[in-house]
Design a protein with these regions (language model features):
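Conserved Rossmann-fold cofactor-binding substructure of NAD(P)-dependent oxidoreductases
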Residues: 71-93
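N-terminal Rossmann NAD(P)H-binding glycine-rich loop of SDR-like oxidoreductase domains
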Residues: 20-44
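Alpha-helical substrate-binding/gating segment
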Residues: 197-215
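NAD(P)-cofactor binding segment of oxidoreductase domains
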Residues: 94-130, 164
Length: 215
Protein backbone atom coordinates (compact mmCIF):
# COMPACT_ATOMS: atom_id res chain seq x y z
CA UNK A 1 0.00 0.00 0.00
CA UNK A 2 2.81 2.38 0.88
CA UNK A 3 4.57 1.57 -2.38
CA UNK A 4 1.40 2.32 -4.35
CA UNK A 5 0.95 5.63 -2.55
CA UNK A 6 4.57 6.55 -3.28
CA UNK A 7 4.11 5.76 -6.98
CA UNK A 8 0.97 7.92 -7.18
CA UNK A 9 2.71 10.83 -5.47
CA UNK A 10 5.72 10.45 -7.77
CA UNK A 11 3.53 10.44 -10.90
CA UNK A 12 1.67 13.54 -9.69
CA UNK A 13 4.99 15.29 -9.13
CA UNK A 14 6.16 14.43 -12.64
CA UNK A 15 2.88 15.76 -14.07
CA UNK A 16 3.26 19.06 -12.22
CA UNK A 17 6.84 19.50 -13.38
CA UNK A 18 6.06 18.67 -17.02
CA UNK A 19 3.13 21.11 -17.26
CA UNK A 20 4.29 24.46 -18.61
CA UNK A 21 2.68 27.64 -17.33
CA UNK A 22 3.01 29.29 -20.75
CA UNK A 23 3.14 28.05 -24.32
CA UNK A 24 4.19 30.95 -26.55
CA UNK A 25 3.79 30.44 -30.29
CA UNK A 26 6.08 32.93 -32.00
CA UNK A 27 8.51 33.05 -29.09
CA UNK A 28 11.39 34.16 -31.31
CA UNK A 29 9.74 37.43 -32.37
CA UNK A 30 10.05 40.82 -30.71
CA UNK A 31 6.92 40.46 -28.59
CA UNK A 32 7.41 36.74 -28.06
CA UNK A 33 10.84 37.26 -26.54
CA UNK A 34 9.42 39.87 -24.15
CA UNK A 35 6.74 37.41 -23.07
CA UNK A 36 9.31 34.67 -22.50
CA UNK A 37 11.66 36.94 -20.57
CA UNK A 38 9.01 38.56 -18.37
CA UNK A 39 7.15 35.29 -17.88
CA UNK A 40 10.26 33.68 -16.41
CA UNK A 41 11.69 36.62 -14.48
CA UNK A 42 8.50 38.27 -13.19
CA UNK A 43 6.04 35.38 -12.89
CA UNK A 44 8.33 32.37 -12.23
CA UNK A 45 6.86 30.59 -15.24
CA UNK A 46 8.01 27.48 -16.97
CA UNK A 47 7.80 28.37 -20.66
CA UNK A 48 7.47 26.31 -23.82
CA UNK A 49 8.74 28.67 -26.52
CA UNK A 50 7.75 27.66 -30.05
CA UNK A 51 9.52 29.12 -33.08
CA UNK A 52 9.63 28.46 -36.83
CA UNK A 53 12.52 26.08 -36.31
CA UNK A 54 13.96 24.62 -33.14
CA UNK A 55 16.66 27.06 -32.10
CA UNK A 56 17.62 29.25 -29.20
CA UNK A 57 15.75 32.45 -28.33
CA UNK A 58 17.50 35.78 -27.80
CA UNK A 59 16.83 38.22 -25.00
CA UNK A 60 14.37 40.97 -25.99
CA UNK A 61 15.67 44.21 -27.42
CA UNK A 62 14.70 47.25 -25.32
CA UNK A 63 15.55 50.51 -27.02
CA UNK A 64 13.84 53.43 -28.70
CA UNK A 65 12.12 53.35 -32.06
CA UNK A 66 10.34 50.77 -34.17
CA UNK A 67 13.39 48.81 -35.35
CA UNK A 68 15.65 46.40 -33.51
CA UNK A 69 19.24 47.42 -34.17
CA UNK A 70 21.34 45.68 -31.51
CA UNK A 71 22.26 41.97 -31.49
CA UNK A 72 21.09 40.31 -28.28
CA UNK A 73 22.52 37.39 -26.31
CA UNK A 74 20.90 33.98 -26.39
CA UNK A 75 18.46 33.27 -23.59
CA UNK A 76 19.42 30.12 -21.69
CA UNK A 77 17.32 29.24 -18.65
CA UNK A 78 16.27 25.97 -16.97
CA UNK A 79 12.61 27.07 -17.12
CA UNK A 80 12.69 27.57 -20.90
CA UNK A 81 12.24 24.81 -23.48
CA UNK A 82 12.45 25.76 -27.17
CA UNK A 83 10.87 23.72 -29.96
CA UNK A 84 9.56 24.16 -33.49
CA UNK A 85 5.87 24.90 -33.73
CA UNK A 86 5.66 22.66 -36.80
CA UNK A 87 6.62 19.64 -34.69
CA UNK A 88 4.00 17.51 -32.97
CA UNK A 89 3.39 19.34 -29.69
CA UNK A 90 1.89 17.10 -27.02
CA UNK A 91 3.15 18.95 -23.94
CA UNK A 92 0.77 20.09 -21.22
CA UNK A 93 0.51 23.83 -20.65
CA UNK A 94 -1.88 26.18 -18.88
CA UNK A 95 -1.96 29.28 -21.09
CA UNK A 96 -1.52 29.52 -24.86
CA UNK A 97 -0.29 32.78 -26.41
CA UNK A 98 -0.32 33.15 -30.20
CA UNK A 99 1.87 35.97 -31.49
CA UNK A 100 2.98 35.10 -35.02
CA UNK A 101 2.72 37.30 -38.09
CA UNK A 102 4.19 38.11 -41.49
CA UNK A 103 5.91 41.08 -43.09
CA UNK A 104 4.79 43.21 -46.06
CA UNK A 105 3.80 41.19 -49.15
CA UNK A 106 4.65 37.93 -47.33
CA UNK A 107 2.42 34.87 -47.10
CA UNK A 108 1.02 34.57 -43.57
CA UNK A 109 0.51 31.04 -42.24
CA UNK A 110 -0.62 32.15 -38.76
CA UNK A 111 -4.13 30.82 -39.33
CA UNK A 112 -2.83 27.37 -40.30
CA UNK A 113 -0.58 27.36 -37.27
CA UNK A 114 -3.42 28.41 -34.98
CA UNK A 115 -5.60 25.59 -36.28
CA UNK A 116 -2.77 23.12 -35.67
CA UNK A 117 -2.38 24.26 -32.05
CA UNK A 118 -6.11 24.29 -31.34
CA UNK A 119 -6.54 20.77 -32.69
CA UNK A 120 -4.03 19.48 -30.12
CA UNK A 121 -5.00 21.73 -27.21
CA UNK A 122 -4.26 19.91 -23.92
CA UNK A 123 -6.96 19.50 -21.23
CA UNK A 124 -4.72 21.53 -18.89
CA UNK A 125 -5.12 24.70 -20.99
CA UNK A 126 -7.00 27.46 -19.15
CA UNK A 127 -6.79 30.35 -21.60
CA UNK A 128 -6.08 31.22 -25.23
CA UNK A 129 -4.54 34.62 -25.92
CA UNK A 130 -4.33 35.86 -29.51
CA UNK A 131 -2.29 38.85 -30.63
CA UNK A 132 -4.27 40.08 -33.61
CA UNK A 133 -4.01 43.54 -35.19
CA UNK A 134 -5.92 46.81 -35.28
CA UNK A 135 -8.01 46.76 -38.44
CA UNK A 136 -9.31 43.20 -38.08
CA UNK A 137 -12.96 42.37 -37.56
CA UNK A 138 -15.19 45.26 -36.53
CA UNK A 139 -12.19 47.52 -35.84
CA UNK A 140 -11.59 48.08 -39.57
CA UNK A 141 -14.43 50.60 -39.94
CA UNK A 142 -13.00 52.83 -37.19
CA UNK A 143 -9.37 52.55 -38.33
CA UNK A 144 -7.54 55.32 -40.20
CA UNK A 145 -6.69 55.32 -43.88
CA UNK A 146 -3.19 53.98 -43.22
CA UNK A 147 -4.55 50.84 -41.56
CA UNK A 148 -7.08 50.39 -44.35
CA UNK A 149 -4.30 50.58 -46.95
CA UNK A 150 -2.29 47.95 -45.07
CA UNK A 151 -5.40 45.77 -44.85
CA UNK A 152 -6.13 45.93 -48.56
CA UNK A 153 -2.60 46.08 -49.98
CA UNK A 154 0.84 45.21 -48.60
CA UNK A 155 -0.33 43.41 -45.44
CA UNK A 156 -3.37 41.92 -47.09
CA UNK A 157 -2.53 38.29 -46.30
CA UNK A 158 -1.62 39.14 -42.71
CA UNK A 159 -5.05 40.67 -42.15
CA UNK A 160 -6.70 37.71 -43.86
CA UNK A 161 -4.88 35.36 -41.47
CA UNK A 162 -5.70 37.49 -38.41
CA UNK A 163 -9.40 37.52 -39.27
CA UNK A 164 -9.35 33.73 -39.61
CA UNK A 165 -7.51 33.38 -36.30
CA UNK A 166 -10.09 35.50 -34.50
CA UNK A 167 -12.93 33.34 -35.84
CA UNK A 168 -11.17 30.20 -34.58
CA UNK A 169 -10.56 31.62 -31.11
CA UNK A 170 -14.15 32.82 -30.77
CA UNK A 171 -15.34 29.20 -31.04
CA UNK A 172 -13.63 28.48 -27.71
CA UNK A 173 -15.27 31.31 -25.77
CA UNK A 174 -17.68 28.99 -23.94
CA UNK A 175 -14.99 26.43 -23.10
CA UNK A 176 -12.28 28.60 -21.54
CA UNK A 177 -10.99 32.15 -21.19
CA UNK A 178 -10.17 33.72 -24.56
CA UNK A 179 -8.56 37.09 -25.14
CA UNK A 180 -8.01 38.84 -28.46
CA UNK A 181 -5.67 41.83 -28.55
CA UNK A 182 -5.62 44.34 -31.40
CA UNK A 183 -2.62 46.62 -30.82
CA UNK A 184 -2.41 49.64 -33.11
CA UNK A 185 1.37 50.06 -33.26
CA UNK A 186 4.10 48.22 -31.37
CA UNK A 187 7.54 49.70 -30.77
CA UNK A 188 10.65 48.81 -28.81
CA UNK A 189 10.56 51.96 -26.69
CA UNK A 190 10.06 55.71 -27.05
CA UNK A 191 8.88 56.97 -30.44
CA UNK A 192 7.74 60.26 -31.96
CA UNK A 193 4.53 58.58 -33.11
CA UNK A 194 1.85 57.06 -30.90
CA UNK A 195 2.79 53.49 -30.06
CA UNK A 196 2.93 50.86 -27.31
CA UNK A 197 6.25 49.33 -26.38
CA UNK A 198 6.53 45.56 -26.58
CA UNK A 199 7.76 45.63 -22.98
CA UNK A 200 4.55 47.29 -21.74
CA UNK A 201 2.31 45.20 -23.97
CA UNK A 202 3.85 41.92 -22.80
CA UNK A 203 3.40 43.04 -19.21
CA UNK A 204 -0.28 43.78 -19.87
CA UNK A 205 -0.84 40.34 -21.41
CA UNK A 206 0.83 38.50 -18.53
CA UNK A 207 -0.95 40.58 -15.90
CA UNK A 208 -4.30 39.72 -17.47
CA UNK A 209 -3.43 36.02 -17.48
CA UNK A 210 -2.14 35.68 -13.94
CA UNK A 211 -4.28 38.31 -12.21
CA UNK A 212 -7.46 36.59 -13.39
CA UNK A 213 -6.01 33.19 -12.53
CA UNK A 214 -5.64 34.24 -8.89
CA UNK A 215 -9.20 35.58 -8.53
Amino acid sequence: MRNLLFIIMFLNLINQVSTFKLCIVGAGGGLGRELVSQGISDYNCTVLGLTANKKSIEYPFRGDGFNENTPMKKMIHPDLVVDSYWNHIDDDYQHLILCTGAGPFEKDYSDRLTLKMLESLPPSCKSINLISAWGTGDSLDSSNWGIQIMNSWYLQDSYRAKNEQEKMIQKFEEKMITRIYRPKALSYGNTFLESTSRFDFANEILENIFFLEDI
